Regions:
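Charged docking surfaces used in two-component/phosphorelay signaling
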Residues: 20-28
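Short hydrophobic/Thr-rich beta-strand motif most characteristic of the beta2 strand and flanking loop
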Residues: 30-37, 45
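Receiver (REC) domain active-site loop signature in two-component systems and cognate sites
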Residues: 60
């Protein structure tokens, strides 16, 4: 028996194709999806729409996913929201650095639908 916890996920990704793919995987799995194409937009949406999980890219124009992570964890309104970093940076040091910034899980690109869902389920209490 598989139990799917339906929740709302904020995806932060500046690549339209990646954003579309991730949204498709999550919507297909029953999640509600909020999209943001940059960190500034993500900070606003994280506060106004209270997502259950935030999935973010690392390399984005303006503010990186790591900086976004730190900002979210410093803000009392968003500090408890689990963050999944989704990045093409695949070295162990990148994963460790993400965790130091406050990330709760790390997925490397390219990822499968199952890898993404497992990471999200691992951070939802």
């Amino acid at each position: 028996v598989s139990i799917t916890l339906v929740g709302t996920i904020l995806i932060v990704e500046d690549s339209p194709s990646e954003l579309q793919l991730m949204s498709h995987y999550l919507e297909e799995s029953g999640y509600n999806v909020i999209q943001a194409t940059g960190a500034k937009e993500a900070l606003e949406k994280a506060q106004s729409q209270n997502p259950d999980v935030i999935v973010t890219d690392v390399v984005m124009p303006g503010m990186s996913g790591f900086e976004l992570c730190r900002s979210l964890k410093r803000n009392p309104a968003t500090q408890k929201v689990p963050i999944v970093i989704c990045s093409s940076k695949n070295q162990e040091i990148d994963r460790l650095w993400a965790m130091r910034q406050g990330a709760d899980a790390y997925v490397t690109k390219p990822y499968t639908r199952d890898q993404l869902l497992r990471a999200i389920k691992s951070v939802v209490i």
